[in-house]
Amino acid sequence: MTAAMEQLVAHTILQGFDAMYGRFLDVTAGAQERFEQQDWSSVHLALKKRISFYDHHVGLVTSQIQIMLGERYANRSFLMAVKSSYENLLLDYPRYEIAESFFNSVYCRIFEHRNINRDKLFVHSSQENRIPTYPTQLTRIYHAHSGLTSLFDRVLDDTPFTQVWEDKQRDTKLIINHLKQELGAAFNDETSLELIREPFYRNKAAYLIGKITLNHDGQYQTIPLVLPVLNNSNKQLYVDACICHVNDASIIFGFARSYFMVYAPAPGALVRFLSNLIPNKTNAELYTAIGCQKHGKTELYREFLTHLDNSDDQFVTAPGIKGMVMSVFTLPSYDFVFKIIKDKFAPQKDISHATVKEKYKLVKEHDRVGRMADTQEYRHFTFERHRFSDELLAELLAVAPSIIKVTSDQIIISHLYMERRMIPFNIYVEQANDDDLRDAVDEYGKAIKQLAAANIFPGDMLFKNFGVTRHKRVVFYDYDEISYMTEMNFRKIPEPRTPEDEMSAEPWYSVGIYDVFPEEFRTFLLINPKVKALFNELHSDLFEAKYWQSLQQNITHGQYEDVYPYRGVHRLRKT
């Protein structure tokens, strides 16, 4: 092989990445029009379409390389030389970090995810110390020298929206009053604001995101600022809320939310700004939140390696009731769990491995409304053998021997998911005090209702299939039985025809495969007397077929419930 061929292959991979990211940006650029035209059905289609580009272009490039090289493509030493040529192409390249992940994906596709190590892939970036830059001005800076009203007038005037504001003067006043209430005397005419030029679009909202620098008697403090903008029935804009605390901003970038549409020709610079804004979010979380989820996967793996290097605990079975379809393990010191699909499922689970994988794919592409955990899917994931106890390894080999390979120093799992670790809801309920229990039951009911309004029926609603986040939000994480709401047939149980019907252990009525009887939910949800009382008070409508039928009608008519990632206390107009 000649150096010219190595360079040609490197150029082919980078051109494939450019084609992919160009399409990614094209779909992202359409977010403003979809928002302004209130084309909500297209919002969901665009998200799904954008997610598909990455794997599609990896496949195209892989095929090109295989055709170019014939049988020679399996020469690993040649591809290491290609990697060296590729590194040279990235020296001044604005999206170098994501381009490295794309190279990894092509390499793994060619070699079917085998023989992955630090030499052959960009396990770590080739430019770890490079500070990413933006091709244009990333932010605008505003000062309050002419007063806070003038500052926020300019902020709203500078947005790229083509629509008029419903009442800009009112919104400016509400923003200022809210910030004064939250920040006190530190929010004054010495305040400055740095705002990202591009809005962040998700579902029915556009988010203006930046940071406020406060100057109180010479003491400087920087805090986040998030202004969600909504679109009224007359297609006029208004600022719905004002968020200025790190934890609240963090929730907006949460792992149970759909990916943002934000136009970012150099995402590394955007992530760098956001990481200063929300320091409790990792690079993996931020790249994923802005739609670069495949690079988020790379960053998550890098963060995992760093955690391994700085810990010595052993993997254990994750807390909670063991699943019928999946086995879950974790490190006690780590914030994620590893989920593997068992070789054989419990008899009552009449599904295939392919179906389980399709359900996880559905969740990634769907609007998760803050109630379904995102996952990252890995193949041929390698662990150090000494970090596993003999007991855990034996358990995993007992349930999934076909996907686990054990050597003297490694455990290689051919397919797994990584997911944010949460407290299983059934455990949380057992340990909660009365106030936390009430909040938890309310959160659980809201989770089911918001999922249903987004056209997701959880299927198995047992408490063990939900988790509680560090922000005490309830999130669903068991996807093997989810379906679209529109596929289900919600029915009221017919009245018994005879006394014998009433006493019968078997139903006296026909039951179709998609039939659901909400009255039966009480049987398995309301075992705990305290939970039963709270559920009947807060969410008794979940046991009525007509409630579910009304949600189905809304979905059929294109009416989707508004679910926003901030609490009512942050809204500028209280309702």
Curated annotation (Swiss-Prot):
Its main location: cytoplasm. GO terms for cellular component: cytoplasm. The keyword Kinase applies. One of its GO terms (molecular function) is protein serine/threonine kinase activity. Its EC number is 2.7.11.5, 3.1.3.-. ATP binds at residues 318-324, 339. The active site is at residue 374. InterPro entries: AceK_kinase (IPR046855), AceK_regulatory (IPR046854), Isocitrate_DH_AceK (IPR010452). It is found in: Cytoplasm. GO terms for biological process: glucose metabolic process; glyoxylate cycle; tricarboxylic acid cycle. Bifunctional enzyme which can phosphorylate or dephosphorylate isocitrate dehydrogenase (IDH) on a specific serine residue. This is a regulatory mechanism which enables bacteria to bypass the Krebs cycle via the glyoxylate shunt in response to the source of carbon. When bacteria are grown on glucose, IDH is fully active and unphosphorylated, but when grown on acetate or ethanol, the activity of IDH declines drastically concomitant with its phosphorylation. This is Isocitrate dehydrogenase kinase/phosphatase. It comes from Photobacterium profundum (strain SS9).
